[in-house]
UniProtKB/Swiss-Prot annotation:
Organism encoding this protein: Scolopendra mutilans
Family: Belongs to the scoloptoxin-07 family.
Annotated GO MF terms: potassium channel regulator activity; toxin activity
Lineage summary: Eukaryota, Metazoa, Ecdysozoa, Arthropoda, Myriapoda
Tissue expression per record: Expressed by the venom gland.
Function comment: Inhibits voltage-gated potassium channels.
Protein name as annotated: Kappa-scoloptoxin(07)-Ssm2c
Entry's localization field: Secreted
Amino acid sequence: MLVFYAPLFVSIFSNTVMGATIDKPIPKPILREAIEKIAVNKRADSRYCKEEKCPPGKHCPKVPIVCVRGPCCF
């Protein structure tokens, strides 16, 4: 009987301990910063952001990574 319960106890205990450490939610500020950084990098890769002279009605800074807001960045 002990042979049956020992592996069962070990598997339940290890799942509980591992589940508590692996399933921790990511803190929201860190996740938000990561998403914003990805969005800025995606906008910086836009073809308009790399041009110094934009089409009429568009606004682009000369430095691509600074291109955070504006129609040409989306």
